[in-house]
Amino acid sequence: MVIDISRKAASFIPVFCIITKIQAIGDKAIYLTDMRGELLEPTENTPADLYSIYNYDDDLSGNTYADPAKYYDVIIACNDYLQKAKEYRDTHVTTVDDDDYRGLISSTVRLKTWTYLMLAKIYGQAIWFDDPMQSMKDIVSRTPKNLSELVDECDKLLNTGFDGINGTYNMSWNEWLDPANGATSTNDEYKRWNMMVPGYFVLQAEIALWKGDYQKAATTILGEMSRTFALAEYQGNVANIKYMRSGSYGSNYGQQYDSEMPMLTATESVIMYDYKYNQQNSLLNHFDRSGSYMMRASVPGSKRFEDTTFNPSADATAIKTSDARFRAIQEIEKDVEYAIRKYRGFRKSGHTVAHDDTYIMIYHTSDLYFMAIEALNNMGRFEPASVLMNTGVDPFYGAGVVLGEQWQGLNCNWGLWTTLYAGFRRTYADNGVRGILGLGKRDMWQTPEDIKEEIIAEQRLEGLSDEDKIKKHNDIELVKEAFLEFPCEGKTYPLMIRVAKRWNDYSFIADFVGQKYESDLAKQAEVKAKIMGGAYFVPWDLQGKSSSH
């Protein structure tokens, strides 16, 4: 995607160089976390470096997949841009537009925050630096910060920012790139430029979850969702409402991954590619059978989608669950081989292996729901957590239920019964994570009466108060749902780690991940032991000389 920005000051152009460097890391989290996670396994074509990731090897020196150098390239570019943009503005005070400056600085602050958050989630450590550097060689003598320290630094950066500008300012690319039409521009390409950078609210919500500040996470995420649902453009007869699992979201499930361009209503932020401008990743080459086919879905991971115990069906008599999300996986030979087709196309293909320019979503509608449910559950607001996981607000609210204090942050704009605009009632409303797909209810506990004795031992809930039993059980149910919702997005392993840290119990990670090694019991035991021993992060010696640069 190339747009003429020659009319703008040349000092602002480097922000696009940051985006280019982010394109280079867009698919890394998928290879690094999902290959170690609950679903993916090698094929006959898997290279040695990727096999080492799958095998949980302790020494990854020189491993081209594990090398974090390209993440640090983004940080170096962010620091360089921040310094040079300030220097330029300081010498051109009267010619630099204040709103543009705030928007560009704030966007860069958020990109840097997101990059460090990714390092924290993948490696559990990173070297933090704010001063200009040229390469990783300039920082290897510094002491790395651990996960908790990095999350604190991300929170500080997001809210303190640079040059008095924090991460709350938005850059309106519509107005910057299409000044003739300004904010009223209907050009979808420009609107997608607004999704190049994660928003403040979604970064703040995820950071708050890592810090255990569930009130802030819930207030932040629910506030933005409710605000968006109330916009005039989403009232009345609208099939797709931004950030809402409603309308055609379920019947058209999958197009948010395989359409030619990202869906505006389902996407919060996205990494875009265009092969015509040499902007590519290698997802299709890794996953597609017409490419190098280096990774595939394991049999145990694939069978979870149809397992009525793991994934309840709406039909109590069904012998297997029909879940639209299973379209992400292609059955090659039943119970033997399953390939990933999530990025190739469920019904039609908008991308090819030769082009390999499928976009990679950073945050989308599902992320917001899962963060909201996680926050609500750990605040003890079990009723709305269960409703958002299952049927959604619409049928619950429409039943005439009087919403109590637990529902703070969710309002009538999630439903349709009291939402009127220009004489129209909203046609579609929230149907929840599972309800929009016509699935059965996941067993989200709400009261001590819901606690099942047979689950206490299975999920290691012994010794916890009833309230904590409910919270931990629901957290594990959220993780199980994430396996179905986020295959091959680089998101399930970090969620498992966050839940495990919360309860100081890593056994469920070992259990879920270990299932895909069932054909090699010795390897299964080895991997489970490593996870229980703390090897859930990708190991990398930041003080060593094994980095590519």
Model-derived segments and spans:
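Solenoid-repeat scaffolds in large eukaryotic assemblies
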Residues: 125, 217-218, 224, 385
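Short acidic-aromatic linear motifs embedded in glycine-rich loops, typified by GG[WY][YF]DAGD(H)
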Residues: 1-109, 116-151, 168-180, 184, ...
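Surface-exposed intrinsically disordered loops and tails
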Residues: 163-190, 234-264, 399-470, 521
